[in-house]
Structures are given as C-alpha cells and as structure tokens.
Amino acid sequence: MEKMDHVAVSKLLGVWISEDLSWSKNCQEICRRAYSRLSMITKLKYVGVSVEDLLDIYILFIRSVTEYCSVSFHSSLTQEQSKKLETIQKTVLKVILGDMYIGYTAALEMCGLETLHARRQKRCLDFALKCTKNPRNRRLFPLNPVSNEQYIRDK
C-alpha cells in the first residue's frame, strides 16, 4: 500500500478544503480572484461602457466566482468570511455606479441585485428541495409520523 502525504490544504475541483474544514483559504482565493477581475470593470467604466453592460459583465465574470460551489460552504462560513465576500459586490457596485452610489442597500435596489448572502441561502434551499424530490434520496429523509410526509417541504 502506498503512503499518502499529509497536506494542510488541498484544492479539489476549484474549491480549497483545509484539514480543519474551515473555509478561510477558499474564501481568500475567491476574494483574490474576484478582486483581480475588478480591474476589468474599472477599465471598461473608464472607456464609457454603460452601467447595464458593466452589471452584466460583473455577473458573468465576478459574481460567478463568488458563487461557484457555494452550496458546499455557505452554511459553514463565519460572519467575517461572509462579510468579506459581500464586500466584493459592494466594491464592484461602488465602481460601477460611481457618483450615483449612495449606499449598499440603495445600490442593490437600483441595480436589481440581491446580497450575495441571500443568493447563497436561496441556492442552498433549492439544492435541499431538489435532494428531497429525487426518488433515490427518499430514504435519507425521515417521514413526519403524523402526516407521513417528509419534513422538508416546498416553499
């Protein structure tokens, strides 16, 4: 039998997993990748790209980075880590809106966006509902003894 090396942190399918199952390295890498792409938004704004187009570019190239595989780590994020991820979107909106930016909540409303936390929460709920509806997973979820239905229900 071949001996395996011990590693403190490992990358698997683009997600960093640490030996203590904290998500600090993964959160750091998400922030690093997202902020490295922010310069693209800044340059495009400088040359006069519209707010609508900048928002589309943000959603495609930056928000997708923050949401990749979020179902696997959302419930385990610390408040500090969640805040760091939210700061990415806040910073992007400040760049995109410029002088029109008056606050994060107003910017979200103006752009028709939700907080990243709310989006991750919805994705987790959607994932849980899909799991309960899959016939192969029925045995994993207990039935309510009164109604003989599963505890997890639709929205």
Q: How would you name each of these model-derived features?
A:
Residues 1-155:
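Hydrophobic/basic alpha-helical segments
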